Design a protein with these regions (language model features):
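A short, basic/flexible loop-to-alpha-helix module at the beginning of a structural domain
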Residues: 1-10, 45-48, 77-79, 262
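Short active-site oxyanion
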Residues: 12-14, 52-55, 112-113, 186-191, ...
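Nucleotide phosphate-binding/pyrophosphate-handling subdomain across enzymes
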Residues: 28, 112, 221-321
Length: 430
């Protein structure tokens, strides 16, 4: 950690953002750094007097599309020091599952592996645990990758779909942020890239992963997870301690993560799955294809402006599955499916501030709603679960797979998933 400390010693430091990572940064600095001053700020970047500080360490949720040499991040500082012993994992979907599976497999192969990063473990919290034998499996978001100088020695870029367009505006800018995980590598590095990822100028040794080359036995649902397993297998083979049998055993034994197509209850002979991590149409479609006998799917959340044509077509093509639409994206998808309405004309107060009211209702009483027979439209998750309970037949499954972010309605996808579980498990009389 010496280079990190030397960059911060005798500096006037501002921590910009005080969530989980901001607090982690504060703890690290107070423990290890000889600083001139240390301030914490939560607010608009326009309110920062940059002349007062030598270094500004921002949280990943604060997106800056332009470079400013005073600004840095945990990720940038960490990779500057530990890039040579880091395996970075990015992609629109599957980052957490692949990272956790890889860490599990490496440990089974006798490698000392630390799982850090966007999975909810700030890297500064674990620096004291790193020694010469440690390998870091680092889940990396687009925000973390946007401003880095050095890339991980081994990079995984799983896939690319439309996401975070509320920040980046275009898919090209979003891809540029992600691509830094490879474009900043050197000739001695390795990268593994999904087949739908656009070309990236690179110096490292690259392998394209298009389909599973082995018949993986998994304890988690989804054909897409066999692709994730293929990435894990290929990376694990780089380690001299890893042989095929041990790698395959570790992949098979991996139990998955919460809120990722997680089966959690059977009530009145209906199986319930929490796929709250789903924030794009492709994830929702994969979820439905991965579960047997799907009776109902709850879709909707914050609208980031991504394209939902593929999901609208999927809903039309699956007439035997009930799709319960809610929140902003649910309303937008309903319009794509034929629901005619004037913006802000239906329950504008309740819809505009859903989480600050106890209102629970639906649009089903409106006459002449020209939606397909397999679609229901409602306001929020509370009523969506009620509709699912009323309309999902015994022997079938109900999936929460929103195809949209939780922000504006819940703190994060974890809170949304936990709330879904509570609604499912509570009795109607509660």
């Amino acid at each position: 950690m010496n280079s990190i400390i030397s960059k911060l010693n005798d500096k006037r430091i501002l921590i910009f953002g005080y969530g989980r990572e901001g607090k982690s940064t504060e703890n690290f600095i107070k423990k290890h750094v000889r600083y001139k001053s240390l301030d914490i700020f939560e607010g608009s970047i326009l309110q920062i007097d940059e002349d007062k500080y030598d270094v500004i360490i921002k949280s990943p949720g604060i997106v800056m599309l332009d470079d400013n040499p005073k600004y840095t991040s945990q990720t940038e500082l960490f990779l500057d020091e530990y890039h040579a012993k880091t395996i970075g994992v990015t992609g629109t979907k599957g980052k957490s599952t692949t990272s956790a599976m890889l860490a599990n497999v490496l440990k089974g192969c006798g490698v000392k592996a630390l799982l850090l990063g966007n999975i909810g473990k700030p890297c500064f919290d674990y620096i004291d645990d790193i020694d010469d034998d440690t390998w870091i499996v680092f889940e990396l978001s687009c925000h973390q990758l946007l401003h880095i100088n050095k890339a991980p020695h081994i990079a995984i870029f799983l896939n690319l779909f439309e996401e975070h367009l509320d920040y980046y505006k275009t898919l090209e800018k979003y891809f540029y942020a992600k691509s830094n995980i490879i474009s900043h590598q050197s000739e001695n590095d390795f990268c593994f890239v999904g087949e739908n990822v656009p070309d990236i100028e690179h110096k490292s040794e690259m392998k394209i992963i298009s389909s599973p080359e082995r018949d993986y036995e998994l304890n988690i649902l989804g054909e897409h997870n066999k692709i994730n397993a293929e990435f894990v297998f290929e990376v694990a083979k780089l380690f001299y301690k890893a042989d095929d049998e041990i790698i395959l055993k570790g992949i098979k034994e991996f139990k998955g993560l919460p809120h990722r197509l997680e089966y959690f209850a059977e009530i009145d002979k209906v199986r319930y799955y929490d796929d709250s991590i789903s924030t794009i149409p492709e994830a929702c479609i994969n979820a439905v294809k991965s579960v047997e006998n799907v009776g109902s799917v709850i879709v909707g959340g914050m609208d980031r402006g991504i394209d939902y044509d593929i999901l609208a077509d999927f809903i039309r093509d699956n007439e035997n599955i009930l799709f319960i639409l809610c929140y902003e994206t649910g309303l937008r998808i309903s319009k794509m499916l034929g629901f005619e309405y004037e913006d802000n004309s239906i329950y504008p107060e309740e819809f505009g501030n859903i989480m600050s009211t106890t209102y629970v209702g639906s649009w089903e009483e409106i006459e002449d709603v020209s939606l397909p027979n397999n679609v229901m439209l409602t306001v929020n998750l509370d009523y969506a679960v009620r509709l699912a309970k009323q309309n999902t037949k015994p022997g079938m499954a109900c999936i929460l797979s929103p195809a949209a972010p939780s922000y504006g309605y819940f703190k994060n996808f974890e809170e949304r998933g936990e709330y879904f579980k509570q609604l499912v498990e509570q009795k109607e009389s509660d």
